[in-house]
Regions:
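Short, well-ordered junction/capping motifs at the entry into regular secondary structure
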Residues: 1-5
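N-terminal (or domain-start) structured segment
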Residues: 6-88, 126, 135, 152-178, ...
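Short coil/turn segments
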Residues: 14-16, 71, 105-110, 132-137, ...
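Stable alpha-helical elements in mature extracytoplasmic
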Residues: 17-21, 25, 48-52, 71, ...
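Hinge/capping helix and adjacent helix->loop/strand transition within the periplasmic-binding protein
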Residues: 28-36, 55-64, 77-167, 217, ...
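A ligand-binding cleft/hinge motif common to bilobed small-molecule-binding domains
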Residues: 68-81, 144-151, 178-212
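C-terminal lobe and pocket-closing loops
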Residues: 186-255, 284-287
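An extracytoplasmic/periplasmic, membrane-proximal ligand-sensing/linker region
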Residues: 240-300
């Protein structure tokens, strides 16, 4: 059984937050839940996390293999033939949400999220938007879903895709682009330092700390919420007993103060869902995101 065996956790992409999450899960399982199995974290990077799911499904029905799940698990198969859809894996948990921040240079003439939207409603190409790391990635989706809700023609946006948050920050600070869209956490130091000014956040409520004064889209009149979520999946073919085992593990792990405090420190929203709830969530994500990607011509 799992209790007296070894577990392999697959880290899905070369992002610091993913590696931190995988290793924190490993640490808490051993130290706080007292689970008596050996565990290891294996990095299977590349292909928008698709390689990790190929590796995972080489072990069908084996509950000793689990992987972090991210939004590209949903959008990747819509855009790239041959990627494994989420329906071919076993959803095990939704762990937390990470919200997206919209920011401008401190002296920008764009004063608010509403100001940003109104400029784009008049002319969708009037404002340059820097986002990482790819079209159909979380920052792009947070942008187009909010602007679509606001009545902007999202097919005509002037989007600049860069390699990472640091490049977005440099572009805005240097005056090369008008608005940057990245994880809220990556903007904190520059907002605190007075170099950037937040104009909107994609969450259901305001964030803490440096983002306490940054309103949500909903506060500014646009009914849009977007989360860059993290979860856990297992391979296809897991049994009800195996799923129940991991439901118990993750429900207990996500209630520990260590898990919740670390999430809040990183501006993450520790929203836990069990296997059945996660499956319904992923199905709903697939429908919502397919519609906007088809509109953009990025999926069929």
């Amino acid at each position: 059984g799992i209790r007296d065996s070894s577990v392999t956790g697959v880290q899905t992409c070369a992002l610091p937050i993913s590696d931190l999450t995988a290793r924190q899960l490993q640490k808490l399982m051993c130290e706080k839940l007292g689970l008596d199995f050996a565990s290891s974290v294996v990095n299977k990077t590349g292909g928008g996390s698709s390689l990790s799911y190929v590796y995972l499904n080489q072990h069908p029905g084996d509950a000793h293999y689990i992987a972090l799940s991210l939004q590209p698990m949903i959008t990747g198969p819509m855009m790239i033939a041959g990627q494994i859809p989420h329906t071919e894996m076993t959803p095990l948990a939704h762990l937390f949400n990470e919200y997206v921040g919209f920011a401008v240079r401190a002296d920008s003439g764009i004063k608010s999220g509403r100001d940003f939207v109104e400029r784009l409603r008049k002319d969708p190409g009037a404002v340059s938007i820097s986002l990482s790391t790819a079209l159909a990635g979380s920052n792009h989706l947070a942008t187009v879903l909010a602007l679509k809700t606001a009545g902007v023609d999202i097919k005509k946006l002037r989007v600049v895709v860069v390699a990472g948050a640091n490049e977005s920050i440099a572009g805005v600070m240097g005056g090369h682009v008008d608005v940057m869209v990245t994880s809220a956490a990556s903007q904190i130091a520059h907002i605190q330092g007075g170099k950037l000014r937040g104009i909107a956040v994609s969450g259901p409520r305001r964030l803490s700390g440096a983002f306490a004064d940054v309103p949500t889209w909903k506060e500014q009149g646009y009914d849009s919420i977007y989360a860059n979520w993290r979860g856990v999946v297992g391979p296809k073919g897991m049994s009800a007993a195996q799923i129940a085992y991991w439901d118990d593990v993750f429900s207990r792990l996500t209630q520990t103060p260590e898990w919740r405090n670390e999430a809040l420190r990183l501006l993450q929203d520790p929203v836990y869902m069990n296997s059945a709830e996660t499956r319904r969530f992923l199905d709903a994500q697939q429908q919502e995101l397919r519609a906007v990607l088809v509109e953009l011509g990025l999926a069929k």
